[in-house]
């Protein structure tokens, strides 16, 4: 069905069909329908309150918008490319239903401030949902940390065995990361949560509107302070996408570790069958597709951020059609982050830990060598000298096919006469782990305290 353009008065020729299709955004911005209608209802009520529209017309507008909303949610709304976007589709349908009053709804506003409002409302809701998914993932990490207290694994630097740590300590490291991610989301929400409606196209409006009343109706604590900035600003979307990129980086690092840990070479964890797939040719395969996909999707989120940064980097104030390109990368980022968090929260809770393999790996690679150096320092030796002594001890062990616990007392004292029988107690895995009692350390009591602190902070 052909639709007359709601802005067509200045034009004498119809829009080229390909131009119409090329410039339309309805295929992707239709997901903003609920926010668009909610914003329009608040705007209409304000127009009535201010005497700009008669209350009888306001009630017709509100009832009509609610009917449009019900029709969309029932899947009975025909979106039209000819009407370009969600705003015009809804307004045109409203006017068809209620007549002249529908044409008055747009009094005192522009699509420029209207879309700025819609995106903020939408993203505000999505950030709340993403924060809930972050809470679910943190809960799963805490669950694994509590369920596996005392399990010792190797800690790595450069992916080489470094020092023994608690598996629970490793899980709590990710609790810290995802807690920071939630904080970044909350910071983004705080800066974003102001009402742009009322800025008009760019300069404000000549009508005696009450922006603060609209803000109250839409649960915004305040309004934007400059009309040009209100319609030009996409910082809030960029900030969200930046925070999402960091969040996905954390998920990607975790994914890489789970992929490694689930290999036959590590065998530290087993992902349950419901989160893995098989091979079309190799019947023995159990592939960690979920963490692999999350790792891959991280680049997609980075790309979305770069895409929007590039769109915005040279735009003069105020609105430009380029800014229509904000929605697809934003929506894709939202969908990717939500999906990744939801599946990760479930997968982490259900994964199985192989404590025996973790402990066996922690006992290899001279993981307690630093403890020998610390032992010598406590006997009065300068740390650099202790480092040299232990380095030579490790070299001797490698040459002779031994590990540190295999050395005899005579061999130990051949490297330093400061070493006594108590060295053997100092280099057990438990002694190494539990010696690290400073705040942030991997000692069992310290990790228990951090788990409780994280639970209280939920």
From Swiss-Prot:
GO MF terms, alphabetically ordered: argininosuccinate lyase activity
Catalytic activity line of the entry: 2-(N(omega)-L-arginino)succinate = fumarate + L-arginine
Record keyword Cytoplasm present: yes
InterPro entries hit by this protein: Arg_succ_lyase_C (IPR029419), Argininosuccinate_lyase (IPR009049), Fumarase/histidase_N (IPR024083), Fumarate_lyase_CS (IPR020557), Fumarate_lyase_fam (IPR000362), Fumarate_lyase_N (IPR022761), L-Aspartase-like (IPR008948)
Listed GO CC annotations: cytosol
Keywords noted in UniProt: Amino-acid biosynthesis, Arginine biosynthesis, Cytoplasm, Lyase
Compartment(s) where it occurs, according to its Swiss-Prot or TrEMBL record: Cytoplasm
Gene3D superfamilies per record: Fumarase/aspartase (C-terminal domain), Fumarase/aspartase (Central domain), Fumarase/aspartase (N-terminal domain)
Keyword Signal set for record: no
SUPFAM superfamilies, per the entry: L-aspartase-like (SSF48557)
EC number(s) stated in the UniProt entry for this protein: 4.3.2.1
UniProt signal peptide: none
Associated pathway: Amino-acid biosynthesis; L-arginine biosynthesis; L-arginine from L-ornithine and carbamoyl phosphate: step 3/3
A Gene Ontology BP annotation from the UniProt entry: arginine biosynthetic process via ornithine
Pfam families xrefs: ASL_C2, Lyase_1
Main enzyme class: lyase
Family: Belongs to the lyase 1 family. Argininosuccinate lyase subfamily.
Name of protein: Argininosuccinate lyase
Species of origin: Geobacter sulfurreducens (strain ATCC 51573 / DSM 12127 / PCA)
Gene: argH
